[in-house]
């Protein structure tokens, strides 16, 4: 049954969880919810409530705050109240006054000054408000009275009118005094705010270093008795009145509510689960504590647990919070500290969670002197490890865990001279209790004796293992306990088999396994080991057929049509293997002329042998700086030359580059441990000879081996470890105890579980329970090896790792300076190019300002070795221009006049000036009186009468190379997207293929991806996590390496006097062995300061300019930059011949780069720019952070300054301050700090205030800015934009053809072909969805806006034509018609579009069937084209005519 309005209000009170003192307000008993209006588009809910009387102000604000907080995840809220009140209460009226004014939406300093000074009062039946003069009275009546009265009405007040009353005693002087006082107060408040921010930041920094506030632990509310029981978070599953929890803060947010109060939102965990904790501030004291609370702190919280009905989650509403200390893991060992020599960071792909910095910091706290990094297959943590080691004073051991492979596995063991065809063979197979020849035993031994391909005898015996078989063994082998119980003993069966084999050639599939068990049994029973030749059919198949995906016995017998039943029963396997052997030997003779046993190993290690070899883990540790370079080469080879499913490293490659590298035996996946586990001491001893040190790990790390029954029990595991220690002693090689760390603390294990779970069943780690592999302390490791005795444990855990670390040099993995390539004569060429062009433009005798600027720049560029960087860029730009593609510059390169003179950029950074192309007269404007040379009035040369060129944008060189000109130049160039691959490949011509690489990137798990992993883990493990716990688990799973990639534009250039391995290993992006370019293995940011990176970007603007030029024949460089028709676009639509209503935009800039978005069009509507320099301002304002909104916008709207005067681009700051007389160096430094959002130091602020030319608003504006755009970048972009806009105004069909061809990727051809009505209907359909519109629909809406404008300007868009349409570009059919390309058809990709055109060029399509077959067009696309009358002339099927038959 529906609740009545009063009951609804009571339900609402429960949901928003008001504090008890407010919830019991008597007036709430009769409160009603009259209506809730849901505004879907704006995501706002309006609550219409009714009460008997107006609520006390404190009650209202508390109610509003909790209502906002309760609905924060759903929508914004607003409240409208009606009451039965007939009379006004003066006290209540006054209490609400400031709130009503602040929420009126009226942005007027006059009103807010009035609010601060006066309050309305009741006199008789009137409500009066004292004002000072007629100006204020008129303002209040015209602009504020109605709005404020309506504001009171919405809060439940009865109707009334506020009458302004002039205070006759107030003189003009008092007004001026008041304003002066207010100005002082404002300045004081601004200063106080700045100081508060500084104090807050200082407090945070202090907390980071000290861990607690200056005056002790934080306490909010009442203290919490230490004896009060603390609930484990996972135990709380329903609402409770009062509980205490204790947890670690992993996320924090402070929200400022409309009332001005603050809401603290903490996310806390005790690692059993997590909770969201909320608390409202009561006063300024609470707010200061809110600021002091930070992530990483531990708190006890007492409060109530309540269900958030909308979020459907339990949250804690805190009453009391107390900061507490939390016990941390310690390393209390006194007899030396351990060194971890096997450790994985978050660069071990999807397998470890913590960055190396976390481990190094912990090692430092524990007093551990060194730490190794040994990620799987990669070295990508090295740069961060180096930085962390320097910061924390910990020595870094640089290593990697690789997949080591033998250079081919023998096909035959125990070679002898024996003709294959005439040999007698015994093909044997064993079934065993497990995989270890040492700890398991044979339970069935079967064989067949064969001559000439026929079975002549057989052998099949069970062996009693003298212990019950496990369920796993029975499942795998089909052998039961009943079958082996009471069978012959091992000694008897093996003696019989030895006699059966005689002198025959033995064979088997994966025979090394069977040989291992057979020889182990022979050894136990004093029988001679096998010395017969033993052929492995697995390796013989791999040698003959490396192309096969697998070489399993069942796969091969099917391929060779050999019947195989009861696979994994020894007798069936042996016979099948025998027949397979004869077929393979026949192929070996035919293909490779192998006819003798001695020949079968001749091709071992030939070809792509590494693909067939079984990898084993090994750790490679750089011992010297030369060893590090060898390590770089080895890892590069494993990722490029020997990659197969994973990077692999042949032993021969390691042997060739082993100098300066120590090789460790690694984990249970290493060959030494595996040999000990499966084949015994002697085999492990033999394998260990290859290694420099032997690793053993805690039994907990080997736990999966027990679970998978690879090791029988704990005693067997201890025996393996003891025997590995004996191997080390026997070979005089150190044995070290390592932890195989994959995360920092035990509680972090869940993150690794989630990551590995996300990989699915393909990841072998998902097949058993994950071991405990946290970063262990010395104490933990000594305890883990206490079964060896204290002395030996100390040796393995502490002494031996220290000995190895002492053998390793202090190694530097990244360079400490920039190494640029050398080009012979680069300095002279740059000087010549620069001066030749300067003289060409400015005459034989350069103007002083030009000469001084060039001298200054060339000295910096040549002196710091940057000439080659400029010359490379010049050659790239020159070639692109020669090939017909303009290049746009990005960033600050346009700040360099040398870049302008050498043709790298079109942007001229000199002050605005006139320049005569005939007699070289020039006139410069150096005092900031003109914003851009393009804004100068047209003028003829006073010397010769030639129309003067206009140029110069007043951009300081310092913004590019720093104040001292020694900052490495970062030249970013925008090439056409079509031309970008050509430009990239041209670098190979310039420097050689082995000296250029793509800049590598590392893709890590992002927030949304991690969230998906957590939800999948929650679902698959049938658990339920609170929202806060999902957030914690997702946060812990982010940042882990997921893949690698390449920077879309970055080309790394290696100088010819070095090689790439001096800087970084190399690889293919995302391990794609077919990729066209190799990339740096290190993320390019890690080596950015050491090696030159060219940014050769692909951009749509140059592509569009090229297409416009091709279609029109107009040279884009000839287009004027001050065309009135083009400039009119930025203040209206008249130059397009349409009204704003027709195109749904007041500005004509739809589709104009930089100016087409709704945000920028809104800026244009407010500012109406008319000059190039004002467009520069718009560009800077729109790209900056906190430069327009809440800053320049307010200054313009309040009339403080106009658009041309506000701070737009970063360079403006330096030049403005210099023009105002401030020191050049300080001006530069202020600009640098402001553009990075770092504020301005107090002494610099004072210097600005002391300069009478610097306005106060300018300083305040600087203090708000977080990021600023470079003026050179804005200039280059606007140049391109104006050229494109020129075609939009004067050549519309060419413009729309180019726009749709180059910039648009989402189309609705049906709507576009229907004309204006169809497009407008589709636009409305999308806009009506509001926030629910998909990204694809939002992108489509942008294209539809342009299509609508195109149609309104009289241009028709036609559906595709099967005979005429292009694959990708729109075509101009006549002056008013565009024909769509095939790629504009939904779901018709580029490849199919090209195939249609290619097939059409061969011959016309005869039918829809023909189109489908030759054009590769799907049935769905055929239906689309048919429905839209594209295929009207085509029959469904090919029709055979009489003439076709003749």
UniProtKB/Swiss-Prot annotation:
Q: What is its main location?
A: cytoplasm
Which part of the chain is the Exonuclease domain?
425-581
Name the UniProt record assigns to this protein: DNA polymerase III PolC-type
Under which main EC class is this enzyme filed?
transferase
Q: What is the lineage of its organism?
A: Bacteria, Bacillati, Bacillota, Bacilli, Lactobacillales
Q: What does it do?
A: Required for replicative DNA synthesis. This DNA polymerase also exhibits 3' to 5' exonuclease activity.
Classification via SMART domains: EXOIII, POLIIIAc
Cellular compartment(s)? Cytoplasm
Which species does the entry assign this protein to?
Latilactobacillus sakei subsp. sakei (strain 23K) (Lactobacillus sakei subsp. sakei)
